[in-house]
Regions:
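Zinc-dependent deaminase
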Residues: 1-19, 83-167
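Short secondary-structure boundary/capping segments
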Residues: 26, 65-66, 115-117
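Active-site phosphate/pyrophosphate-handling residues
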Residues: 4, 33, 55
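A short acidic/small-residue loop/turn micro-motif
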Residues: 41-44
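Short beta-strand scaffold segments in enzyme catalytic cores
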Residues: 24-32
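Helix-adjacent hinge/juxtasegments
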Residues: 49, 54, 58-91, 95
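Short, basic and Ser/Thr-rich N-terminal targeting/leader segments
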Residues: 20-24, 70
Length: 167
C-alpha cells in the first residue's frame, strides 16, 4: 500500500518539476482515501512556506474539519525539512513515509531528527519507499537548473570609476 500512495506523491512531484519547482509531492491518507495533496509551489507562490507537506496538511485539515490528523499517514517524496517536520508534529500525524533522504536539510533522520526530540508527538517513520524514482527526479531537476543558471547572461560588473558622480 505504501508504494501505491508514494506513486501518487510522485505524480505531484512531476507536476512541480514541470512548473519549474523543486519536485516534491505529498499526499495524506486516512484509511484508503487521499484526504490531502500538495506539491512545492515556492517559486509560483513567492513563499518560503509553500512546501508540499504544508499544502497537503492544510488541505487535509480542511477536508476532515480539524487540525488533528490522528488517523492519517503522510507520504512525501523527499525527507521533510525542519519546517515541515514541525507541521507534521503539530498536526499529530502518526505515520510518515518518505522516498529520498535529504542530506542537506532532512529533519527526520539525515541532518537531525525532530521526531525524536522532547516534543509532545512522535510519528512512526518509514523511509526509502520508491527512493530511486524520487531521487532521480530531484537529480534531473537540479542538473537542469545548473545548466540553466550557467547559460544565463551575467550582470556586468560596474567599475568604481563608472560609479563616481552617481551619488
Amino acid at each position: 500500500m505504501d508504494e501505491r500512495f508514494m506513486k501518487e506523491a510522485l505524480v505531484l512531484a512531476r507536476e512541480a518539476f514541470e512548473d519549474g519547482e523543486v519536485p516534491v509531492g505529498c499526499v495524506i491518507v486516512r484509511g484508503d482515501e487521499i484526504v490531502g495533496r500538495g506539491r512545492n509551489r515556492r517559486e509560483q507562490g513567492k513563499s518560503a512556506l509553500a512546501h508540499a507537506e504544508v499544502e497537503a496538511i492544510a488541505e487535509a485539515c480542511r477536508n476532515l474539519g480539524g487540525w488533528r490528523l490522528w488517523e492519517c499517514t503522510l507520504y512525501v517524496t523527499l525527507e521533510p525539512c525542519p519546517m515541515c517536520a514541525g507541521a507534521i508534529i503539530n498536526a499529530r500525524i502518526p505515520r510518515v513515509v518518505y522516498g529520498a533522504s535529504d542530506d542537506k536539510c532532512g529533519a527526520v533522520r539525515s541532518v537531525c531528527s525532530l521526531f525524536d526530540m522532547k516534543f509532545n508527538h512522535h510519528p512512526q517513520v518509514e523511509s526509502g519507499i520508491l527512493e530511486e524514482e524520487a531521487a532521480a527526479l530531484l537529480s534531473e531537476f537540479f542538473q537542469n537548473l545548473r545548466i540553466e543558471l550557467r547559460n544565463r547572461p551575467k550582470w556586468k560588473k560596474v567599475q568604481s570609476a563608472e560609479c563616481k558622480g552617481q551619488s
